[in-house]
Amino acid sequence: MAPSSQLEFNVVRKQPELLPPAEPTPFEWKELSDIDDQDGLRLHISGFFIYPPSTMSNVGRDNVARDIRLGLSKAMVFYYPLAGRIREGPNRKLSVECTGEGIMYCEADADVRLEQFGDIGALSMPFPFMDKVMFETVDDGILGTPLMYFQSTRFICGGIVIAGCYNHAIADGLGFYMFMAAAAQLARGAASPTPLPVWQRERLLSRVPPRVTFIHHEYIHDTPKTETANPLDNEPWPLHSIFFTRVDVAALRAQLPGHLRKSATSFEIISACLWRCRTAALRFAPDELSRLIIAVNARTKFGPPLPQGYYGNSIMLPMVVSEAGKLVLSGLGYAVELVIEAKGKVTEEYVKSVADYLVLNGRPHYVVTNTYLVSDLRQLVEMSKFDWGWGKPAYVGPADVGENAISFLATLKNGEEEGVVVPIRLPESAVGRFKSEVSKMVSFGCLEDVKPNRDGYLSRM
């Protein structure tokens, strides 16, 4: 069998169609929140749903497309702003015009079996079939264009991949998966989705008058004199996936001081390890600033909390900063303390201060210079929620990390061993250094790239 990265296969797409809501929906204008319309969210984000052939054996090819169309069109009745188009007003303020036009959908067929890419339950980034199962003609802009694009690709084994691409200004990742879970529920015959969607974007608008009460390093674009152009920026940054076992995490935990050894979470430990090792591998100057952003869900930080059905952007991006030399030369506990500090910043007042800062400063992009952003997706989705009547998917999550400086933690079963997989982009010249840095920090062997072995399971190289 040819290695999956070299596998040649074809995908034949049908004519894309504009899929409207199943019923007429209200025509109105809805203002997005001041968190939604920041510059860093004005882009498209993709997600994969991989259904192995074992769940699809009794499902006809036409039935799959029927179920997807039905579920998506019914879900848009409840999530009707998603069938509209985003417009920009004065001061770059975004609103959605609820036009009821709909979203884009395309069917496709692949002349290959899913298992030819390795064990389906252990597939991880980079997905070798990604480009061919994504909707082919996603508009570059976010204004006046469909808010979602979907392609369902049927493989000759009967397996299917649903690839979605959504406008990040209208929803965060949790909101997107909420919509997809609703579509699956409605396709199975539910009268309405649980939870029901809630708009309430006014709860994340800036105050009148705005008052910034925190220092928001994540949006302050000052460039210290010690930061210089990094020649690595001119190299390709291919995507790798690394796998942390429970033993690896335990080895890292053992290095922490006593007060952190029991209290630090696996996310805090892994994020700190990755930040430190990435900084060393990229060879920042000792006095250069290395930045870490931790994505924090603020839904529960409000009093009362945002409703369960809230699908707008509520992920905060608190940043901590360290001189690279201190970060690399200090023990792991130093980096873990900073991760905990970042997470602890997010309160209701912090969220309001972010909205105020964004409005006062032209809705800027978060700082990307020497920045690494980490998110925890392990609790984001429950596989059972995405059963369209065919069974649970083997994978639910992003199709790619997008930018060079973003990683997320996801649960993965590597053969018989369950652990945490983390996709990360690195310049080729830094990959060896990164692996070396991580191997120094774990007492169990050497952490390497995740790749399928001859049995299809993920293994260290």
Swiss-Prot record:
Describe the pH profile of activity: Optimum pH is 8.0.
Q: Keywords for this entry?
A: Acyltransferase, Cytoplasm, Transferase
Q: Where does this polypeptide localize?
A: Cytoplasm
User: Some GO term, biological process aspect, for this entry: which one?
Assistant: piperine biosynthetic process
Q: Which Pfam families match?
A: Transferase
Q: What does this protein do?
A: Involved in the biosynthesis of aromatic piperamides natural products such as piperine (1-piperoyl-piperidine), the pungent principle contributing, together with several terpenoids, to the aromatic properties of black pepper fruits, and displaying numerous pharmacological activities such as antiproliferative, antitumor, antiangiogenesis, antioxidant, antidiabetic, antiobesity, cardioprotective, antimicrobial, antiaging, and immunomodulatory effects. Mediates mainly the conversion of piperidine and piperoyl-CoA to piperine.
A cellular component term, taken from the record's GO annotations: cytoplasm
Q: Where is the active site?
A: 168 (proton acceptor), 387 (proton acceptor)
Q: What is its EC number?
A: 2.3.1.145
Where is it made, tissue-wise?
Confined to immature fruits perisperm. Also detectable in roots.
Place the motif Microbody targeting signal on the sequence: 459-461
Organism of origin is: Piper nigrum
The family line of this record is:
Belongs to the plant acyltransferase family.
* Pathway in which the depicted protein is active: Aromatic compound metabolism
Stated name of the protein = Piperine synthase
Which reaction is recorded as catalysed by this protein? piperidine + (E,E)-piperoyl-CoA = piperine + CoA + H(+); pyrrolidine + (E,E)-piperoyl-CoA = piperyline + CoA + H(+); (E,E)-piperoyl-CoA + 2-methylpropan-1-amine = (E,E)-piperlonguminine + CoA + H(+)
| Source superkingdom | Eukaryota
Recorded GO molecular functions are: piperidine N-piperoyltransferase activity
